[in-house]
Amino acid sequence: MWLAEVGRERIDETIDPELTIERALETYLKKGYSREWINQRLQAIQVRKELTDEWDSRGVKQGVEYAILTDEITKAWSGMTTRQYKNLKGLKKENLRDNMSTLELVLNMLAEATTTEISKEKNPQSFSENRSVAKEGGEVAGNARKDIEERTGKPVITSKNAVDFSNLISNVIENDFDKSE
């Protein structure tokens, strides 16, 4: 019975893709994410899709080549590889973007959106050229990160992950409730 219901839901989502977005929204809300963060995350998914569409048009292969280019972008903006970043946050198989703060997510989007725009202008023809473009796009966001850190006096990248963000949200809600009593 359960399997049939899940199958029906997926068929309905194929007919009406908005249902998929609504399901994702409900899932993120249940995990304790704020609506603001969820909106950023959904936008990040769109930015990533535009980047991978651009890579597809340049002949970049899904899988290993996507991973190498993503690593170049991440390294250029965050100062660490994707694996190092996941290790910092204590992640194994979890999605790194789902465990980023709003600012980390925005900088990652800036890196990916910039990479997409540079690629459209430079028209890279080889994997090596795509790799250089990925590094350039990441560097733009890396410069923004360094500027933010200089102005705020604190690091943008933290070890906090989704569990920490959920706990923070719960604490804020509890404190607000306690104050209202």
Annotate each language-model stretch with its function:
Residues 1-181:
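Positively charged, phosphate-engaging catalytic surfaces used for nucleic-acid and nucleotide handling
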